Design a protein with these regions (language model features):
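A short, flexible N-terminal coil/short beta segment enriched in small residues
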Residues: 2-30, 134-135
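Structured catalytic cores of large enzymes
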Residues: 4-12, 42, 49-136
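Short, charged N-terminal beta->alpha structural module
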Residues: 20-47
């Protein structure tokens, strides 16, 4: 499944720090695959595909032990149960109860919206002024 050979790093993680998970429905859609490929190029990520849920890639995640996981998915395939299950998956890579990677969902109204989200995240958001509503 891997696109390249992986070496074990000093931190105990194999291969890359970044993994992209996406559905086979996204794989069949050229516009959405541009989003996947942009993430792959930007982060040197491995990409894994699933039929129904990211849980199908748990063995791959256990092998790679990524630090970051991005899920590229069409909005109609996302729901409450999807997110809850992903929270569980993020804690099942090893034996302890803690989250094993940071994860997020890249989506949009359409593939162009998802790509715009990706493009706008290139630079970190810096807050220069803020108003606090907490009184002491």
């Amino acid at each position: 499944m891997s696109s390249f050979a992986q070496k074990k790093k000093a931190n105990g993680r194999a291969g890359g720090e970044y993994v992209v998970l996406t559905s086979k429905a996204v794989q069949q859609d050229a516009a959405w695959m541009q989003v996947v490929n942009a993430l792959k190029e930007k982060h040197g990520a491995e990409v894994f595909f699933y039929e129904k849920a990211p849980r199908e890639n748990l063995v791959d995640l256990q092998r790679v032990k990524p630090r970051y996981v991005a899920i590229v998915e069409k909005p109609e395939n996302l729901n409450r149960d999807y997110v809850i299950d992903m929270h569980h998956v993020s804690r099942e890579v090893d034996e302890d109860i803690f989250a094993d990677f940071l994860w997020g969902i890249i989506t949009g109204y359409d593939a162009n919206g998802a790509m715009k989200m990706l493009d706008n995240s290139t630079e970190p958001l810096v807050i220069k002024n803020a108003v606090a509503t907490i009184t002491e």
